[in-house]
Structures are given as structure tokens and as C-alpha cells.
């Protein structure tokens, strides 16, 4: 609840007091640009109807008053009065004293290890998720929070993985096709198409933008071995940062190069750090794929030894069983991973029997959009 509003700096700023003693400040220009009235933002989709050039450069707060659960602000020279709900102001306050350390993640992200996740893998049945919005919300929320989830009860048939992506968005087609087969082949153009074990990795780091989601569905599996593993790259990065801050800095500030040229007519290249931070230091992406790593040429000579030491330690932590959650997919099961965070691996399997998986890519914008829409509808229903 708002307790006071104090205009300062000749109307350029305003200080708000909150019950409990908290105080936040806002700039007049920021408030005017983010006004919630129907002349500034579309009532239908919330998109802004004006540009920054439509707002006078000399905009000031002429008057402000707390009315009920809102702050009413009058702007000059426009003579425009706008109401801001207190809850909205609190949620969008940017006047923060704390400085975040590089590598921070939002509150919605929960890092995990084998100890915390092996016996509590998030999962849902396809039928329940398809027919129940609450089940789908919980499953999508798990992907957002943990970076992966399992789905049971799919048809054990070719193309069933599309049913998973259809729950929230669209398949991202690549040079591998709309989806691709993961089974042993003669003369494969990718090590995934063998019965060899695969080191933990993220997929397609040679693309920019990288596919942000991957789905793997099991059609047939009668082999010995071949278990799937997932590793929380954010948890591993945090462990590296805790023991070797300088190594973390090098892997997050120096770009690596990735490339792929395994198919006729396809040559893919990308240059991004293995540990990618946003401009404000937020940990936003892990790219780790030994098979696709090109020569590292963007690290200063003086730092190359330290870079490789950090790279080696990062790989050692990724291989540490304490970070690995393992499960074996059965026909009709699939799992989804956030390809910007969670690495996946495969144990080697026998040459007898059959192991047939199918994989495809999708993007998080569709998943997060669907989740946000469901959460909004539940919130409206509760009001």
C-alpha cells in the first residue's frame, strides 16, 4: 500500500513510500512513456501507441495524488493525467540498491543436481496435459523452472513427438528436417546416429539463434544401455564460478566458435561464449558441444592457458555424476530440454536389439507464451 508521494527535482522525479517503510523513485519521463491509458497503449494487446518523440522532452510531473490503490499523476506540459495501480508500480520498480553478481538467474529458475532431482523428475501424461489446462500449466512451468520434463503416454509411432510441440507452439525446422531419426546408421553424418555414448552437450551451438528447445521421443527401445542423461548447465556454471571466478569470467566473456559441415550444401557457423551472460550479468545460455567446437581464436594469447584450464574444469564438472540425472526412455515416452540451459547425454548401447528415437526442435517463446496465457486465464478466473 502506498503511504506518500513526494515530487522532487523540479518535477523530474517522484518518490513513493510504501507500507513497511520501503521507498522507490521513478522518473517523470519513464512514467509518461509507460502510461497505461488507452491513448498511450492499446486496450486490446497492450502495445504502445505513441513513440518517444511524441512525448515532450521537457515532460515533468505537475501534480501527484494517492487515490485508493493507485497513484494519479498529472504531466506537464501535456496537461495529461494518468492513474498507475500501486501493484503495477511495485512490480515494475527499477530503483534498486542491490548489485547483482554476474551469473545471476531470475527467481523462477531453480538449479538442481542429482541429489535434488533424480527421484523427482517432472513429468506428465500426454492425455492429461492435452485435456487438462492445469496439468499442462504445471508441466510447462516445470520446463521453465528446471529446464526439462518428461512426457508419458504418447503413441509409440513415428511423428508422435509433434504432439508434444503442438501442446505449446511450433516445430523449428532445420537442415535435419521437420524432425530427425536417432538410431544407428551406416556412414552417419552425426555421431548421434551411432550406438556410441554421447558426451553431455547442448544441440546446434553452430546456429545463431540456437534452437531453444529440443524434444526426443522414443518409438522403440529393446537395447541394453542407451540411457538418457540431463545436466543442469546453470548449476554447473555456478559451481565453476564458485571455485574459479576468473575461469568463469573467461568462458563468459571470450567467444567460442562452433561449426557444422556434415551435410552437402550446409555450412553453419556461430560465435558465442560457452557461458553467455546478458548485458546486466544474467546467465542466459550455455553452449557446450565438443564435437562442434572450432579452433578457439578469440582469446588473447596471455589468457589462452587459463581459458583452456577453465574449459577443462567446466567439462570435468559436466561429467561429474553428482550433476547427472539419468533415465531410460520407453516407447511412448518423450523428454524436452531447454537447449540454452540443460545438456543431455546418452550412454552407449549394445549392437543387439533396436533403439529408435525421434527428435525435433522448437522455441521457448511459444512455450512461455502458452504458459503465460494459461496463467493469466487462471488468474482472471480466480478474481
Swiss-Prot record:
Q: Which GO terms describe its cellular component?
A: cytoplasm
What processes in GO biological process is this protein linked to?
carnitine biosynthetic process
Q: Which InterPro entries match?
A: AlphaKG_dependent_hydroxylases, GBBH-like, GBBH-like_N, GBBH-like_N_sf, TauD-like_sf, TauD/TfdA-like
State the compartments where it is located.
Answer: Cytoplasm
The name on file for this protein is Probable gamma-butyrobetaine dioxygenase
Give the cofactor binding note: Binds 1 Fe(2+) ion per subunit.
Q: Name one GO molecular function term.
A: gamma-butyrobetaine dioxygenase activity
Q: Which organism is it from?
A: Mesorhizobium japonicum (strain LMG 29417 / CECT 9101 / MAFF 303099)
Q: What family, per the record?
A: Belongs to the gamma-BBH/TMLD family.
Q: Which CDD domains match?
A: CAS_like (cd00250)
This protein's pathway: Amine and polyamine biosynthesis; carnitine biosynthesis
Give the Pfam families listed for this entry.
GBBH-like_N, TauD
Q: What does the function comment of this entry state?
A: Catalyzes the formation of L-carnitine from gamma-butyrobetaine.
The EC designation for this entry is 1.14.11.1
The residue stretches assigned to a coiled coil in this entry are none
Any idea which positions bind Fe cation? 201, 203, 344
NCBIfam families documented for this protein: carnitine_bodg
What does the record give as the reaction this protein catalyses?
4-(trimethylamino)butanoate + 2-oxoglutarate + O2 = carnitine + succinate + CO2
* Origin: domain of life: Bacteria
**Keywords of this protein's UniProt record, alphabetized?**
Carnitine biosynthesis, Cytoplasm, Dioxygenase, Iron, Metal-binding, Oxidoreductase
Amino acid at each position: 500500500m502506498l503511504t506518500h508521494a513526494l515530487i522532487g527535482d523540479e518535477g523530474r522525479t517522484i518518490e513513493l513510500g510504501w507500507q513497511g517503510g520501503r521507498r522507490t523513485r521513478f522518473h517523470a519521463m519513464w512514467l509518461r512513456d509507460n502510461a497505461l491509458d488507452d491513448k498511450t497503449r492499446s486496450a486490446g494487446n497492450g502495445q504502445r501507441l505513441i513513440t518517444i518523440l511524441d512525448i515532450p522532452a521537457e515532460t515533468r510531473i505537475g501534480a501527484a495524488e494517492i487515490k485508493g490503490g493507485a497513484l494519479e499523476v498529472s504531466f506537464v506540459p501535456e496537461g495529461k493525467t494518468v492513474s498507475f495501480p500501486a501493484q503495477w508500480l511495485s512490480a515494475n520498480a527499477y530503483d534498486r540498491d542491490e548489485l547483482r553478481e554476474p551469473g545471476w538467474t531470475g527467481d523462477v529458475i531453480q538449479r538442481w543436481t542429482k541429489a535434488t532431482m533424480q527421484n523427482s523428475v517432472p513429468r506428465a501424461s500426454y492425455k492429461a496435459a492435452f485435456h487438462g489446462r492445469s496439468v499442462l500449466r504445471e508441466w510447462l512451468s516445470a520446463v521453465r523452472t528446471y529446464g526439462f520434463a518428461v512426457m508419458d503416454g504418447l503413441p509409440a509411432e513415428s511423428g508422435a513427438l509433434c504432439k508434444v510441440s503442438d501442446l505449446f507452439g511450433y516445430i523449428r525446422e532445420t537442415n535435419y528436417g521437420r524432425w530427425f531419426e536417432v538410431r544407428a546408421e551406416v556412414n552417419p553424418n552425426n555421431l548421434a546416429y551411432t550406438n556410441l555414448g554421447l558426451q553431455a552437450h547442448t544441440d546446434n551451438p553452430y546456429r545463431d539463434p540456437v534452437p531453444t528447445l529440443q524434444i526426443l521421443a522414443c518409438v522403440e527401445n529393446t537395447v541394453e544401455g542407451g540411457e538418457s542423461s540431463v545436466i543442469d548447465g546453470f548449476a554447473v556454471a555456478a559451481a565453476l564460478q564458485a571455485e574459479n571466478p576468473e575461469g568463469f569470467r573467461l568462458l563468459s566473456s571470450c567467444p567460442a566458435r562452433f561449426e557444422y559441415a556434415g551435410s552437402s550444401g550446409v555450412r553453419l557457423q556461430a560465435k558465442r561464449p560457452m557461458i553467455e551472460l546478458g548485458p546486466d550479468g544474467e546467465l542466459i545460455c550455455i553452449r557446450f558441444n565438443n564435437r562442434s567446437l572450432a579452433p578457439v581464436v578469440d582469446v588473447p594469447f596471455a589468457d589462452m592457458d587459463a581459458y583452456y584450464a577453465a574449459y577443462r574444469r567446466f567439462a570435468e564438472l559436466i561429467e561429474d555424476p553428482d550433476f547427472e540425472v539419468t533415465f531410460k526412455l520407453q516407447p511412448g515416452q518423450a523428454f524436452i530440454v531447454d537447449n540454452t540451459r540443460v545438456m543431455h547425454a546418452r550412454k552407449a548401447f549394445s549392437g543387439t536389439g533396436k533403439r529408435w528415437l525421434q527428435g525435433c526442435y522448437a522455441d521457448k517463446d511459444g512455450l512461455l507464451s502458452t504458459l503465460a496465457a494459461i496463467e493469466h486465464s487462471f488468474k482472471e478466473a480466480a478474481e
